[in-house]
Amino acid sequence: MLKQANQQVLINHNRLLTRSFSRRFFLKGLIFSAWAPYSLSTPIKLELDKVKLYSAATDHKGDHWLVIANAKGESLNQLRLPSRAHQVFKHPSLPLVCVVARRPGKYLSLVHMNTGTLIKTISPSKGYHFYGHGLFTQDGRYLVTSENHIKSGEGRITIRDRLSEFSIVYQYASQGVGPHEIKLTNNGQTLVVANGGIKTHPDKGREKLNLNTMRPSLVYLELLTGKLLEKVSLPEQLHQLSIRHIDINQHNHVVIAMQYQGDKTDQVALMATHKRGEYIRLLNAPINSYLAMKHYCGSVCFDFSGMYAAATSPKGDRVTIWDTVKGNIVDELRCRDACGIAAFGKQGFVVSSGAGKLYHYNIEHKELKRLLPQTFLTAPPLVESKVNVPSPSKRMAWDNHLSISI
């Protein structure tokens, strides 16, 4: 425990050191390494009429939906889901989106993005459940998911082949417990896994069963074999800092957003970065900035430049912006129940909230602006062919994650 250890973690010249200092882990004493600067990418020109947003959502009755919307946040298609979902992501070339059930998940829904029609529902193998995240490989052939082997409590990566009706063709250990978000490096051959370290069991719902012994990790695996290429963890004193959500930029640098499972009075960093062959680097921020995040980050992503990252903290009603080259926070904004976030425009992000609102953030101007003229996301007008669409006058709350296709 941090309070018992009375230690402080310092990051200095890419080396992790521990030294006795105070009752808790104090952020103001951290020394942070910065990456060498690199030039910004060529800005992406957006054709707004082609932009689509994807997210799970919940209506006023507690029913759960897949929502596909345009750049203004106007709903284009919706599909009722059997239970609450977590992540939605698009196939790289086909008009197909995948919806992953929230942990402990029991379904994947494959949906036609242009019609909102359910194409296929996939259940986990016996003795497994989904952990809320997945991805399609760059060539679009394979569907990859993070899963839990219930009996052992160990994480698994499962790969299904689209060309054989999404049957399982590869399955291997995630090299940790509680794998959550997964990403591919730019070559498409290496899978990066955020092993949150938290053991769960479906019979216990969402109860966390191993908080005293949890050991999160960030691992790099060979995609089609599961061969361990690299595994990194934070120091033992931070073993309750769950590595949950990640993103990768064009330089294969990883940004990490974490959730702390320890004492509520502990003062800990929640944001970090990693580069192959190095240690995990915590990002610098004033103590009050991290405290305002309430030990919880909900989602994270890089902007298109790969230099800046944004993280949401729904428990703290915060959106924070980070310069990953300098290794520090550059902006923070209040945003009620902000959670979903995705890169959008030149050095910008779209943020979704549990209040049903959408915002655009511009790094240059440091402004967070509403995208919707109305307060809540609403459904399109009812038509006979869309019997599953709820009343357009009822509020819909965006769920944890947001995806964008251009």
Regions found by a protein language model. Name each.
Residues 157-162, 211-223, 269-276:
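Beta-propeller blade signature
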